[in-house]
Amino acid sequence: MCLVSQEMRKLAPELDPLRIGTGWKKEDLGKVQVMVESTYGDSHPGSGHLNILVEEVRKGIAEEGGFGARYFCTDICDGESQGTDGINYSLASREMIANMIEIHANATPFDAGVYLSSCDKGVPGNLMGLARVNIPSVFVPGGTMNAGPEMLTLEQLGMYSAQYERGEIDEEKLDWAKCNACPSCGACSFIGTASTLQIMAEALGLALPGSALMPATSPDLLEYAKEAGRQSVRLAKMKNMKPSDIVTIESFENAILVHAAISGSTNCLLHLPAIAHEFGIEITGDTFDRLHRNARYLLDVRPAGRWPAECFYYAGGVPAIMEEIKQHLHLDVMTVTGKTLGENLEELKNNGFYEKCDKWLQEFNKRYNINLTKNDIIRSYDNAIGTDGSIAILKGNLAPEGAVIKHTACPKEMFKSVLHARPFDSEEECLDAVLKHKVQKGDAVFIRYEGPKGSGMPEMFYTSEAISSDKELGKSIALITDGRFSGASTGPVIGHCSPEAVDGGPIALVEEDDLIEIDVIERKLNIVGVKGERKSMEEIDRILQERRIAWKPRKPKYEKGVLRLFSQHAASPMKGAYLEY
């Protein structure tokens, strides 16, 4: 067994005393050295408890004869920065987390790594970082928070806030929702970006089977963290199995099929391609569209479904989803257990995993005085909620590279429609118009210059919630943007419109009262008329050419700092918006 940590000790005589000064004992220096990297911090509930899991990981490492060193790079919370310029830092923070993992791992020799995070940018940042570092690694998902009273979950706050702004509820009701929506640590309890990415980590084979989206307060999660520590040492000692030995294009295809089955966040179209890029694998929006077509949508969990995210684990989690779609999966892919996916699934059927999950489901039933079964949460393949996946990539003269819609969260009435354009150059202007009832039935509301190069690609969460929570507008208008949406967003919202406005994409050329065609079934997104009148496609092409000649590029929004760097080098949203150099 050749360990890089021991080779470096021979080359750098100061390494041992520096580690002893940090608290290592002399006998620790010759052990397998594992970097335990987490997003622990007081930044939000998804990271606030990770220090507890870190210590369990270190115990597991020690049990296998290794030593775990703690490294931290906390993440920010989209929910805490919503509605402010702080949200512009969100996507860029993913790159910085990956960069810090690279720096931590490569500046100091380690034989293996364990990575812990729960939420939107922490999970993909960790997965990008572990791919880049490529030492034997295990990822530990931080789990989900519990639901509150009346099964209240955080994604409902946007609805409550919009109702309050419209005078539909009083301040007392809004305050009740605020005080009860986050009753514990963990990721927000719906299938938003955080939950989706935890599930993707397991589906890729980088987390232990069954570990994604456990309740963060569960003792099961502590044991999984400890086992992840043990497994990291085993991988370093016995197989030196690296992430690049595990993750293949077939792994990503499995993950995307799971994404379809859970109706996962559209932000995965930013994160999975960026993770794949670090592995030297190319996936795009077209990959998602191909695999989602005819795929089964099975999960009845919020925001598209009825139940909070903790129910996902109680119903059997990722393994239960994979069992239902097994005939479409690559079962021979390798996983972090050192076994294939097919071997893992068979083992879980025989080791009491599903029986343990069901016991937790019965406890949940008692808590809320209901009688849920596994099949109420995860449908069978033959009784699927939907049979065309959960997202679609729309293309046309408005989005030549593509735009994404989560059609499972969109009213069927909007699947084929022609609307009147109402363009806005910032979310603030658009939200103000929606709340003041200046947007009408039949409008297509545009928010542009909010892509990666424009402003950092923030979420349009408040605007989408204001629209979807309005009984009239939620079924009669669309929101189209080169920005993105929260994983909690519902309604007729189309994001990632590419090329983005700042690059002169067609979304920058849209004018008031252009006619906008949306066709989810045929995957079309086109400008089909101007000033409220239909035109031929040849006429539209000519008009867009004239508008392009008159269009003037905007001055860069940022002149210094992280967002200047990100806006200069971010790739197209359809490629993953990672940094291109």
Give the residues covered by each predicted segment.
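Acidic/charged coordination and interface sites in well-structured regions
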Residues: 52
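A short, small-residue-rich loop immediately preceding and capping a beta-strand
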Residues: 105-126, 138-141
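Catalytic or ion-coupling anion/metal-binding cores of large enzyme and transporter domains
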Residues: 1-46, 55-73, 79, 85-90, ...
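Glycine-rich, highly charged phosphate/nucleotide-binding loops
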Residues: 90-99
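Glycine-/small-residue-enriched capping loops at alpha/beta junctions
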Residues: 49
